[in-house]
From Swiss-Prot:
The gene is Grina. It comes from Rattus norvegicus (Rat). This is Protein lifeguard 1. It is a multi-pass membrane protein. One of its GO terms (molecular function) is calcium channel activity. It is found in: Membrane.
Length: 348
């Protein structure tokens, strides 16, 4: 049996020694390393090489370079060398983290904006002041026109009440009342329905003057049929009521302009009540009718005052000073006539 066959039969754990080499324990072989691709440097050792370079293996070419990376002081793995980007916020000496910066928002850290922030350019404040000044001028103009109208009416009532000749003339010529009523009605329709006309100066003031003169004549003629004491009392009560309602409408938080629909329905009911009083001549019924009329037009005075002030749901345009004066004037005249009716019927 040959030497190889005896090894297989005996079952020794070591193969037979090759000829020419001593038999005995041998030094461990270094681990097998896969050769790199052609042209690449040898793989690094298990330890980290120092910056000065370690000697390579006997079969390697000198110190080992960094595999696949350029040599240099503290190379960045896989990234190009360059200065680090600066934060948009200056460094904090106390080590606090910088505030969060939205990438889509403009950079404010370098303070390169031109001019103040946008809210300084807001033009709402001058417009608010301008609107307030316009409203105040509108209120002054309306009350000036209203004062002139009431002065004309009060003078006419005083003449028709205290001058006997005038009182006798108007009582003898009742047809003048109907003429003045027709003039008043036409001018009232024109000023109420024709918006362009009542904004056209000076024709709006001309129409308002005609309406004031015709209505003053009517009121003076009605007052001439009552005694002087009743007229003076009605003037005083009307002045007190109107002054109180105007002050209350300026101070209250309640919005009377929201009740416009209810007041219009009440006017229709009052008109039907007036037709009933024409056919049923009763003193108590006339006092009730006059009381309801005075109350209704007192509410209208409150509504028109708030429309004039413009601080509630509905308001008048500053161009409608003629229309505002017309509303207040007719409200006050109707309150005076209803109060005069109440006093006159109560004294009978």
């Amino acid at each position: 049996m040959s030497h190889e066959k005896s090894f297989l039969v005996s079952g020794d754990s070591y193969p037979p020694p090759n000829p020419g080499y001593p038999v005995g324990p041998q030094a461990p072989m270094p681990p097998y390393v896969q050769p790199p691709y052609p042209g690449a440097p040898y793989p690094q050792a298990a330890f980290q090489p120092s910056p000065y370079g370690q000697p390579g293996y006997p079969h390697g070419p000198g110190p080992y370079p960094q595999g696949g990376y350029p040599q240099g002081p503290y190379p960045q793995g896989g990234y190009p060398q360059g200065p680090y980007p600066q934060s948009p916020f200056p460094p904090n000496p106390y080590g606090q983290p910088p505030p969060f910066q939205d990438p889509g928002s403009p950079q404010h850290g370098n303070y390169q904006e031109e001019g103040p922030p946008s809210y300084y350019d807001n033009q709402d404040f001058p417009s608010v002041n301008w609107d307030k000044s316009i409203r105040q001028a509108f209120i002054r103009k309306v009350f000036l026109v209203l004062t002139l109208q009431l002065s004309v009416t009060l003078s006419t009532v005083a003449i028709f009440t205290f001058v006997g000749e005038v009182k006798g003339f108007v009582r003898a010529n009742v047809w003048t009342y109907y003429v003045s009523y027709a003039i008043f009605f036409i001018s009232l329709i024109v000023l109420s329905c024709c918006g362009d006309f009542r904004r056209k100066h000076p024709w709006n003031l001309v129409a308002l003057s005609i309406l004031t003169i015709s209505l003053s004549y009517m009121v003076g003629m009605i007052a001439s049929f009552y005694n002087t004491e009743a007229v003076i009392m009605a003037v005083g009560i009307t002045t007190a009521v109107c002054f109180t309602v105007v002050i209350f409408s300026m101070q209250t938080r309640y919005d009377f302009t929201s009740c416009m629909g209810v007041l219009l329905v009440s006017v229709v009911v009052l008109f039907i009540f007036a037709i009933l009083c024409i056919f049923i001549r009763n003193r108590i019924l006339e006092i009730v009718y006059a009381s309801l009329g005075a109350l209704l037009f007192t509410c209208f005075l409150a509504v028109d005052t708030q429309l004039l002030l413009g601080n509630k749901q509905l308001s008048l345009s500053p161009e409608e000073y003629v229309f505002a004066a017309l509303n207040l004037y007719t409200d006050i005249i109707n309150i005076f006539l209803y109060i005069l009716t109440i006093i006159g019927r109560a004294k009978e």
